[in-house]
Amino acid sequence: NSARGFDTVNEKYQECQTKMEEAEKTASEAEQEIQSLNRRIQLLEEDMERSEERLQTATEKLEEASKAADESERNRKVLENLNNASEERTDVLEKQLTEAKLIAEEADKKYDEAARKLAITEVDLERAEARLEAAEAKVLELEEELKVVGNNMKSLEISEQEASQREDSYEETIRDLTQRLKDAENRATEAERTVSKLQKEVDRLEDELLAEKERYKAISDELDQTFAELAGY
């Protein structure tokens, strides 16, 4: 009986020893698995930290990119507005250039017309001056003739009948010469009025020509400025 009891106890001991070894093995495996899991957790935490850092970096870069995009959009709108303003300014300058060209062409026409009128008036003035000189010479000639007749009347000693007859003749001659003198004086006066009128017309045309020249110069200066502004764009 004692031997049988010992065997039973020994079997139980062996069984317990086996179970203990299995338990220790299981515990050791569990510890190893725990350590492995801890390492995996640590790696995952480190990877998460790196992921969070990358996420933070990506978020910051995204914010910077968003700000850059906003700034780029603002710059684009500014450039677009500047471009629109430049196009509008160019259109205005082109219209001003067209108007200035038309004004310059009109000024050229007026300048040519004024120069032509001035040339014609100068010719008329020369002719009038020539007529005035001729009329004045004729007046002097008639005055000399009248003086000669008067002197001859005083120096002649003739009979009363002859004197009377010649007096009538002389009176007729004097009347004729007086009338011719009056006509010549009238023509001279008319010629003087014509010359004065033509001189006023010449003065007016010269003033008009000067004004057209000044206006033409102003238009030319404006054209030069417009071309310079267009060249700047």
From Swiss-Prot:
An example molecular function term from Gene Ontology annotations: protein homodimerization activity
Keywords in alphabetical order: Allergen, Coiled coil, Muscle protein, Repeat
Keyword Coiled coil annotated: yes
Location of the region described as Disordered in the Swiss-Prot/TrEMBL record: 48-88
GO biological process: regulation of muscle contraction
Coiled-coil parts of chain: 6-222
Pfam families in the cross-refs: Tropomyosin
Record's compositionally biased regions (Basic and acidic residues): 51-79
Annotated function: Tropomyosin, in association with the troponin complex, plays a central role in the calcium dependent regulation of muscle contraction.
Family per record: Belongs to the tropomyosin family.
Domain notes: The molecule is in a coiled coil structure that is formed by 2 polypeptide chains. The sequence exhibits a prominent seven-residues periodicity.
Assembly information from the UniProt record: Homodimer.
Stated name of the protein: Tropomyosin
UniProt source species: Magallana gigas (Pacific oyster)
